Amino acid sequence: MEKPSREAFEGNNKLLIGIVLSVITFWLFAQSLVNVVPILEDSFNTDIGTVNIAVSITALFSGMFVVGAGGLADKYGRIKLTNIGIILNILGSLLIIISNIPLLLIIGRLIQGLSAACIMPATLSIIKSYYIGKDRQRALSYWSIGSWGGSGVCSFFGGAVATLLGWRWIFILSIIISLIALFLIKGTPETKSKSISLNKFDIKGLVLLVIMLLSLNILITKGSELGVSSLLFITLLAITIGSFSLFIVLEKRATNPLIDFKLFKNKAYTGATASNFLLNGVAGTLIVANTFVQRGLGYSSLQAGSLSITYLVMVLIMIRVGEKLLQTLGCKKPMLIGTGVLIVGECLISLTFLPEILYVICCIIGYLFFGLGLGIYATPSTDTAIANAPLEKVGVAAGIYKMASALGGAFGVALSGAVYAIVSNMTNIYTGAMIALWLNAGMGILSFVIILLLVPKQNDTQL
């Protein structure tokens, strides 16, 4: 049978299912480790700092490379890069499950981050190329369900699989899903950008960004173990500050920068992107709360994950509600309402000093508010970021916005896990969890202030 040409091909359900399955390899499977930290500590015979690196490094590498991967997809083909991303996920999953060596766990998670960086921009571009009008809106809705829904259910899913089958089955299932995705996407005509930019990719900027973020991640996760006066700590701190300073200088001079800082001259875009970074940072709530109820209350990973089911339900319901609020109230009010509700949820989840039954009730209600808030915030924030970017820079602006999402999640998990470990060692796990969760509430409050100050009442100010 002759393969259909790009011009003749129309997106169908087979391709869409393949796209959604490829998306959940990151948002559902890779992210589900937030609920199996104690199990991984025992399985790999390692400390919580090493496990925190393994958990956070996937989102970290996804965030670092997502903009560059989007450019590669445009140049060499979106189908090709999606397939490469799926194959990388299979490779990363295999490295994670074949041994009990912590180094292979970290390398496997790193490769999964590269996989997500390839899959996310490439699949969005495929949808834009092959789905039109209402079909495109439908496809984007399913893509969002795969990402937001996957992140909502990942805690429960990880706990359920780890308890019933063993944690390695998370990645065995991920490999199976990846193979199905490859089969469903096979036969789709390649799609590339018609106008390839002649500008060279900003390799120097990418290298400096990788050095800076890796150094910072190690400082956060291993800082207390290294000691602030140790030579390695001071060296890593100097590398972080030096690479960050050099990155800023070079990016401002570059003709085709990795991060175009001119975009941040627009207050609305800055407010949406900065608040997005911080609210993705509250993903640290999941790793702290799940670890606490397992270590402190003796719950299984399945029981711990069950507490967050209200989060999953509410975030899926409220995404469409947030869209309607955006249409009637503009962008600022829904973003403020969503963030405010999320802060209330964070505060409820942080009440670790309560008796067990009362704390469980607070957790269930807290996760409900958590999902409700994120669901209301999501669409208005994305719309604000995209609407306030000039037409010729929409792709770059969207890439930076997604980079903020991934890096926010990575550092939120790393920082929350580090604070939990440090304070728990100094006091007890109840206080450690409470302080770490207060940190997440603080990020929510800072996000609220940024939205209040930077996002205009009417989203009509363009660059």
UniProtKB/Swiss-Prot annotation:
Entry's transmembrane regions: 17-37, 53-73, 86-106, 107-127, 142-162, 165-185, 201-221, 230-250, 273-293, 299-319, 334-354, 357-377, 403-423, 435-455
Superkingdom of origin: Bacteria
Keyword list, A-Z: Antibiotic resistance, Cell membrane, Membrane, Transmembrane, Transmembrane helix, Transport
InterPro entries given in the database record: MFS, MFS_dom, MFS_trans_sf
UniProt cross-references to Pfam families, sorted A to Z: MFS_1 (PF07690)
CDD domains the record matches: MFS_MMR_MDR_like
Entry annotated with the keyword Membrane: yes
Biological-process GO terms, alphabetical: response to antibiotic
GO cellular component terms, semicolon-separated: plasma membrane
UniProt name for this protein: Quinolone resistance protein NorB
Gene: norB
Cellular compartment(s): Cell membrane
Family: Belongs to the major facilitator superfamily. TCR/Tet family.
Biological role: Multidrug efflux pump that acts independently of NorA and is one of the factors that confers resistance against diverse quinolones and chemical compounds.
PANTHER family: MAJOR FACILITATOR SUPERFAMILY MULTIDRUG TRANSPORTER MFSC (PTHR42718:SF9)
A GO molecular-function annotation: transmembrane transporter activity
Membrane topology qualifier: Multi-pass membrane protein
Record's keyword annotation contains tRNA processing: no
Major subcellular site: membrane
